[in-house]
Amino acid sequence: MKSFKIRSAALAALLPLAAIATPAVAHDHAAPKAATLYAPITQAEVEAAQQAWGNALVAISTEYDTKGFAAAKTLAGQVLDGAYGYGMGPVLFKPTLTVAPQTFRTSRDGALAYFVGGDKAFPNDSGFALKGWRKFQIDNAGIVITGNSAISMGNVTLWDAKGNMTKVDKTWAWTRGADGNLKIVLHHSSLPYSAK
């Protein structure tokens, strides 16, 4: 796995302004929050966030299998609120198995529908997180860190309770939230291309 730290002004300009801005602190009591918000992200934090995402997906599947849809939906909502940046604004989310006109899910409701289904506004969603996932593996092709923003790209391999395997190409981008934790602000997932 390759990790890159970018210092180039050209690439930094492509990332959120918050990643390169230095906050002006007007009052001493604001300093701890601002310092946390703008603290540089580390590779260990990115890898921990990826593991937390995989563990959450398995937990939602297990919750569905053991306690039913309502419990899985509640847990999925908690995961979205904790791991994704929907509370900060739109998230650029392109799930693996979506079709036009609902390919992109910039709202929390759209993401929740993708993960657990059951939303009439998203009739093609059957609940990706409800597919019996029991194990996962993340293999990064690379991680790019610029200040308080990070991007990773690689593969996520998932196994269900029967041992069936699904591999997806995955790109995530994070920024640090006001609580100091990483928040997913971009999530792109697709099935690997297979030349015929």
Task: Report the location of each language-model feature.
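Bacterial N-terminal signal peptides that target proteins for export
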Residues: 2-11
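Juxtamembrane cytosolic interface motif at the C-terminal end of transmembrane helices
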Residues: 21-25
